From Swiss-Prot:
Optimum pH is 7.5 in phosphate buffer and 8.0 in TRIS-HCl. The keyword Iron applies. GO terms for molecular function: heme binding; iron ion binding; tabersonine 16-hydroxylase activity. Tabersonine 16-hydroxylation is orchestrated in an organ-dependent manner by two genes including CYP71D351, which encodes the T16H2 isoform acting in the foliar vindoline biosynthesis, and CYP71D12, which encodes the T16H1 isoform acting in the flower vindoline biosynthesis. The gene is CYP71D12. PANTHER family: OS06G0641600 PROTEIN, OS08G0105600 PROTEIN. This is Tabersonine 16-hydroxylase 1. Involved in the flower biosynthesis of vindoline, a precursor of vinblastine and vincristine. Hydroxylates specifically tabersonine, 2,3-dihydrotabersonine and 2,3-dihydro-3-hydroxytabersonine, but has no activity with naringenin, tryptamine, secologanin, strictosidine, ajmalicine, vindoline and catharanthine.
Length: 506
């Protein structure tokens, strides 16, 4: 139905767009005369290459096109010039050599505008002083190592309750994917808001709906110059409706925090405890943010923390468990390591997680094969430049296919094989300097929440491996991906836990 609606709109707009297409073709011809655009597949009138991106996962389709046209491609998605990078060398050009030229996000994606409270968040705000101030706040106060460590007791408590709940269902087939997702949301909710409340379940539901709605294709994004398309876009109104409900809950949470802001903070182990909303409101009160930090900005940042932090962590834990079920030798090796390190304690806490070198390799390998956001987030070229002799037009959307790069046979031995051992002696890390490995992006807009995400991945995985052996009632797991900005498995993971005899969660 959606496809026919798309064709209907394309037909109605044919005459109007054809004149613009002809004009733009004339403008683009200057590149063929003087500068050469990167290679790419043939285009058709109006749609450009948009029709080639239907019928499958976009990151798969782009990888296959790159095999034919090269690691630096030019596509036309409607009227939008789009550059696709599919190799470490091209990624380095974007994230390092020309980093500042690719530091912007597209400013004409309506869905981004709505959920980011008019581009006022950390993720999609325009590159400039405001973004630098937000980045400073996130790196120094919200998501710093010190801040993440301050939530250690929350993580340990939530994960232990999670383990007890699973232990009570021994021998019963459980939806582990759902349990993991609820756990990560629970940790993030307490870190952000201080406690779970009556709105938590509804908040999670709306956030999930928003994330899925943003990922849906919107014809208006293909023709940003045709403003009236937004007026007839069902996608826009769907996102706005969900976002208004989401905003009501966040507004209520902010109001509650403001009412208690002058009250003494809770005490734990002799230390004052602030949640992330407290931190943001304190910055707002101090007024030391160069640009005004209003409630709208705070709400946008809250959306970032949940949409990015929870999805990345829960998706990675889920994929890691799936891969270990498929590869029992890996599972056994990871279990032996964590049980050896924490044998005396009888339970896993964060004190010795750094000793779990093999588990860290499992996480790295999971992120190589299954980066949560396989195409990262799009960037926009701020001014015309050259990459490998090709012209990159100003205002082009730029996509880096991190999924394809992580499976590049020129850089990875047996790239389709799940083999954590490859990382045991490797210096490749998450920091964006290893361009063959970019699960969190790179350059100055690399994900600021890496530390927060990893903390929510390591402890749950270690506990699941320590306390239980796992049985799958399915001969062959479905490893197909779902659709969306964040790529989960198509099916939830159902497993049967068997309590490990030496474990005794207190």
């Amino acid at each position: 139905m959606e496809f026919y609606y798309f064709l209907y709109l394309a037909f109605l707009l044919f005459c109007f767009i054809l004149s613009k297409t002809t004009k733009k073709f004339g403008q683009n011809s200057q590149y063929s005369n003087h500068d050469e655009l990167p290679p790419g597949p043939p285009q058709i009138p109006i749609l450009g290459n948009a029709h080639q991106l239907s019928g499958g996962h976009t990151h798969h389709i782009l990888r296959d096109l790159a095999k034919k046209y090269g690691p630096l491609m030019h596509l036309k998605i409607g009227e939008v010039s789009t550059i696709v990078a599919s190799s470490p060398q091209i990624a380095e050009e974007i994230f390092r050599t020309h980093d500042i030229l690719f530091a912007d996000r597209p400013s004409n994606l309506e869905s981004f505008k709505i959920v980011s409270y008019d581009f006022s968040d950390m993720v999609v705000s325009p590159y400039g002083n405001y973004w630098r101030q937000l980045r400073k706040i996130s790196m120094m106060e919200l998501l710093s190592q010190k801040s993440v460590q301050s939530f250690r007791s929350i993580r340990e408590e939530e994960v232990l309750n999670f383990i007890k709940s699973i232990g009570s269902k021994e021998g019963t087939r459980i939806n582990l994917s759902k349990e993991i997702s609820l756990l990560i949301y629970g940790i993030t909710t307490r870190a952000a808001f201080g406690e779970k409340n009556k709105n938590t379940e509804e908040f999670i539901r709306l956030l999930d709906q928003l994330t899925k709605a943003v990922a849906e294709p919107n014809i208006a994004d293909m023709f940003p110059s045709l403003k009236f398309l937004q007026l007839i876009s069902t996608s826009k109104y769907k996102i706005e409706k969900i976002h208004k409900q989401f905003d009501v809950i966040v507004e209520t949470i902010l109001k509650g925090h403001k009412e208690k802001i002058n009250k003494p903070l809770s005490q734990e182990n002799g230390e004052k405890k602030e949640d992330l909303v407290d931190v943001l409101l304190n910055i707002q009160r101090r007024n030391d943010f160069e640009a005004p930090l209003g409630d709208k900005n705070i709400k946008a940042i809250i959306f970032n923390i949940f949409s990015a932090g929870t999805e990345t962590s829960s998706t990675t834990v889920d994929w890691a468990m799936c891969e270990m079920i498929k590869n029992p030798t890996v599972m056994k090796k990871a279990q032996e390591e964590v049980r050896k390190v924490f044998n005396e304690e009888g339970n896993v806490d964060e004190t010795k997680l750094h000793q779990l070198k093999y588990l860290q390799a499992v996480i790295k390998e999971t992120l190589r094969l299954h980066p949560p956001v396989p195409l990262l987030l799009p960037r926009e070229c701020r001014e015309q430049c050259k990459i490998k002799g090709y012209t990159i037009p100003s205002k082009s959307r730029v996509i880096v296919n991190a999924w394809a790069i992580g499976r590049d046979p020129n850089y990875w031995i047996e790239p389709e094989k799940f083999n954590p051992d490859r990382f045991l002696e490797s210096k490749v890390d998450f920091k964006g300097n290893s361009f063959e490995y970019l699960p969190f992006g790179g350059g100055r807009r690399i994900c600021p929440g890496i530390t927060f995400a990893l903390a929510n991945i390591e402890l749950p995985l270690a506990q699941l491996l320590f306390h239980f052996d796992w049985q799958s009632n399915t001969e062959k797991l479905n490893m197909k991906e779902s659709r969306g900005v964040t790529v989960r498995r198509e099916d939830d993971l159902y497993l049967t836990p068997v309590n490990f005899s030496s474990s005794s969660p207190a």
